[in-house]
Design a protein with these regions (language model features):
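Generic beta-sheet signal
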Residues: 3-7, 102-108
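N-terminal beta-loop-helix "entrance" segment that forms/cooperates
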Residues: 39-51, 72-76, 147-151
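Phosphate/nucleotide-donor binding subsite
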Residues: 62-86, 97
Length: 160
């Protein structure tokens, strides 16, 4: 069986990475890095810096892949997002099939908390339930930008 970890890595500051995320990072054999184009190259660099900072040893590898893109401002937003997520599903499924051996652990590193505004959980859930792969997955929560911002301003979320 292959295992996927969807790891929340905080709101852009490596100090926001939780101990649960650090423990998860150290279980991973292959990290899938989604390249979203030249304007977002620093996001991949920061993900790799987080790995360098927190992973003990070098028993892991990085697989870079070009992430499907969407065109903002289209008339049918929901259809566009559905198409984008289908394209991501095809890519993720190919990566899992071709880049992971049975018994390996792969990971997607998600900014903030993966349960907020991110399609990765939904896409991996579809792949896992399809029956085409012997796959399990786990979600590791992270510090969201909302939490970090509230803390920085010394307030509570219920006061915003």
């Amino acid at each position: 069986m292959k295992k996927i970890l969807i790891i929340g890595i905080g709101a852009g500051d490596p100090d926001y990475v939780t101990m649960q995320a650090v423990n998860a990072l150290n279980q991973v054999d292959v990290f899938f890095m989604m390249d979203k184009g030249p304007s977002k190259t620093k996001l991949i660099e920061l993900r790799k810096e987080i790995c360098r900072r927190y992973i003990k040893g070098d028993d892991h590898r990085f697989v870079d892949a070009t992430s499907p893109q969407w065109t903002r401002g289209t008339e049918d937003y929901f259809s566009t997002v559905d198409d984008l997520n289908r394209d991501k599903q095809v890519l993720f499924e190919r990566l899992i099939a071709e880049e992971m051996a049975d018994g390996e652990c792969g990971a997607f590193l998600v900014w903030g908390d993966p349960t907020l505004y991110d399609s990765t959980i939904r896409i991996i859930e579809i792949i896992a339930s399809s029956g085409r792969h012997d796959l399990d997955y786990e979600v590791i929560p992270g510090i969201s930008s909302i939490q970090a911002l509230a803390a920085k301003h010394r307030t509570t979320l219920n006061r915003i």
